[in-house]
């Protein structure tokens, strides 16, 4: 598996934490591309902050299960889920769409978030899937020309995205991790730019 986790420097609401998840997925998919790997399963774990139960205002909004953290403090039970993809890929857009849909489904938007983990499971070398051939059961009711045109358009879109991913990797290697930043990285709550300036979790 390939993955990453992040402990936020302060509690984030669900919308700000979603920005961090997007950043982590960007990095995860670039990591897959760099290693020539693909996945069809992403696991998302979101840990809530102790303030949710310590603060009376937040406490009365929560009706769910409570767990003790490793220090014995009570916190809402973490959100945990799996996004299964139709086929193995390293596409940022496909992985992002699946995981953000999962995020919206499992995360309690009333709770403050302190930890986020994303992991790509069932990872294999991309060469192994390029050698696989898909067989489709033929029937009389499918417009196979339309299906072929749709598949061709999807393939061209993926190839364009792949070239962009490889270009981003090349620029980051040559000029540093902050040489290419997306609009997401400049939003309030984004952490990638600051994390890129740190070595071993500390400012360089």
In which residue ranges do the predicted regions lie?
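Basic, low-complexity intrinsically disordered segments
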Residues: 1-204
